Amino acid sequence: MKTFWNTQGGLSQLTEWQPNCWIQVTCPTEDDQRELEEKFNIPDYFMSDISDTDERARYEYDDGWMLIILRIPYVKEIRSRTPYTTVPLGIIHKRDITITVCFYETNMMIDFVSFQQKRGEGFTDHVDMIFRLFLSSAVWYLKRLKQISMLVDKAKRNLDKEVNNESLIGLSRLQDSLTYFQTSIRGNETLLSKLKFKLQIDELDADLIEDVNIEMTQARETTLIYSNILESTMDTYQSIINNNMNTVMRTLTSVTIIMMIPTLITSMFGMNLVNGMEEKPWGFIIAIILSICVSGMCWWFFRHKRLV
């Protein structure tokens, strides 16, 4: 899907392309990609690089065309292997042509358009737009981190009631998401530091870059804090599970030993050995009483040693 935006004096939608407008491309089909490449002579590998979900944040310049790939947050289904992940957003520019391409429909881009329309100022140039996209991505990383924090708290409350596999698997998935966030944010920070020297920056852009740096730093540090907390939480519950397992094994071993004593004593009386009670009518009662006494002593000993 292609949308044309007039970026001068506010963000308003156009019916067709005009010089210096912004072309927003979301979930492009093969026909959309082919049309853009043929109409604007975009290098053919630009689209394939942007479509690669594992493509790192980077800057590239080819025959007058500039390609910037930014990693932005994206939410899958909550029960998926990684509910929160990141996807590439491509920014393509040459002279009066500015195109953004994302192969996923993200809340960040929807919010970006809505926010710029509320501002009613548009963009001063393509550099201003690029850094505002950086700022929006940092803000949305923080939003998604708050959601992850809420899911972690919910899982911890469930685990406090009962240690179950579903909650532990959920925490593990969120840990994977934080790893993706941390890697992508660092890549965006590295890209931002390079763009400071690649693009022509005026005083307004410098102020905007400072805001982006602040938000990026906060997002990175927040991700690191949540990751450390989640890792510590996982280690704690792993220790609890191991401790519970050890307790169960000690109890089973102790009960097995206690249950083995009557069998051992009655087996001794059942052997063809002379013990002086073969002809006594109360021999069986003595064997039972002896088994109970020895088992009781073993039970008391294990309880005293906190083995059961």
Language-model-derived ranges and their functions:
Residues 41, 217-308:
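Hydrophobic alpha-helical transmembrane segments and their immediately adjacent juxtamembrane loops
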